């Protein structure tokens, strides 16, 4: 997103460190030619952040963060880590994968700190949050070795219970990450888990998430989904189904009215697409309906969901 507020260009965040439990992802904003060179492996990822000067280096937009904490997986990049990073002035990121399972299991463990019940108490439709508590909360926790109560499986046309659970649990995680401060919080989802995406994204937006990050696929429809939810409208996502083209592929949708009745407008989070190929980044940048506000570029050192090698094999002295 440009400093003027439009999505006429996308900003590039170069991921210069492998993402692991004990490190973070350090980013630098760069122009398209330099980011493209990193993606193609013809230039190393820069090791500094926001270096000023030089005709080819742009000033960071006002909303940029020097450090974007990586989404490192379910139960690792949780609300406590994201909140701690945000309190230092950087962008804390919650891993949104499987939050319905993570939150409901914590409730079944008795929610000993009371954090999730406190978050659910702030859900805008109290009786929906109470339904989740009634179904999953176990006072004192389940016995050792006892099985957890399962959550509904993902399907193309989820039940009302399933959709509401996705919204409520994502709301709770983002609420806790943002509680008590005005720092920025992002949530990381996977394009591959498409059947969950509309409902979980809406739940995060309902809690005021500031950024949505997504990779592991081609997240071309996410900007349009965010636009729809920000207006209180139904959001729809075309499913990638082998053997189907755009005209015949099924879609999954979510209507905010199914949760809130008369759904109010919501602040639209910025969208950062995670890419590891110039081809994908160029495709997403072509039209406003697919263009993200920025890219997180996973180069050869990023250690993320890097795409398979493309193009002609090139070998150098080091391999």
Enumerate the predicted regions with their spans.
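Tryptophan (W) side chains
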Residues: 11-12
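Short linear sequence motifs
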Residues: 17, 32, 36-43
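Residue-identity detector for glycine
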Residues: 5-6, 20, 41, 53-54
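Low-complexity, intrinsically disordered or signal/transmembrane-proximal segments
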Residues: 4, 24-27, 40, 47
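Active-site entrance/lid segments in N-terminal catalytic domains of soluble metabolic enzymes
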Residues: 28-30, 35, 46-319
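Intrinsically disordered, low-complexity polyampholyte segments enriched for Lys and acidic residues
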Residues: 15-23, 34, 48
């Amino acid at each position: 997103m440009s400093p003027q507020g439009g999505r006429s260009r996308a900003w590039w965040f170069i991921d210069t460190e492998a993402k692991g439990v004990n490190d973070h992802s350090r980013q630098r904003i760069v122009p398209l030619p330099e980011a493209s060179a990193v993606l193609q492996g013809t230039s190393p990822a820069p090791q500094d952040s926001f270096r000023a000067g030089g005709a080819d280096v742009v000033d960071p937009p006002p909303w940029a963060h020097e450090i974007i904490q990586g989404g490192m997986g379910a139960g690792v990049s949780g609300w406590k880590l994201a909140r701690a990073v945000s309190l230092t002035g950087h962008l804390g990121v919650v891993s949104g994968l499987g939050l319905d399972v993570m939150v409901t299991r914590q409730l079944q463990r008795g929610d000993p700190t009371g954090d999730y019940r406190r978050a659910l108490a702030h859900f805008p439709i109290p009786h929906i949050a109470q339904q989740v508590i009634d179904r999953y909360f176990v006072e004192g926790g389940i016995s050792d070795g006892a099985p957890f109560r399962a959550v509904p499986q993902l399907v193309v046309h989820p039940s009302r219970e399933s959709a509401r659970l996705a919204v409520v649990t994502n709301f709770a995680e983002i609420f806790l990450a943002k509680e008590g401060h005005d720092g920025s919080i992002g949530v990381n989802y996977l394009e591959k888990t498409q059947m969950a995406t509309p409902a979980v994204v809406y739940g995060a937006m309902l809690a005021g998430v500031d950024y949505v990050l997504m990779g592991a696929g081609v997240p071309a429809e996410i900007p349009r989904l965010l636009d729809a939810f920000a207006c209180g409208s139904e959001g729809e996502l075309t499913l990638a189904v082998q053997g189907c083209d755009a005209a015949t592929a099924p879609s999954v949708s979510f209507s905010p009215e199914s949760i809130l009745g008369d759904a109010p407008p919501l602040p639209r989070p910025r969208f950062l697409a995670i890419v590891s190929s110039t081809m994908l980044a160029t495709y997403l940048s072509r039209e406003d309906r697919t263009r993200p506000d920025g890219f997180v570029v996973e180069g050869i050192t990023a250690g993320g969901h890097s795409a398979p090698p493309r193009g002609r094999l090139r070998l150098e002295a080091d391999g």
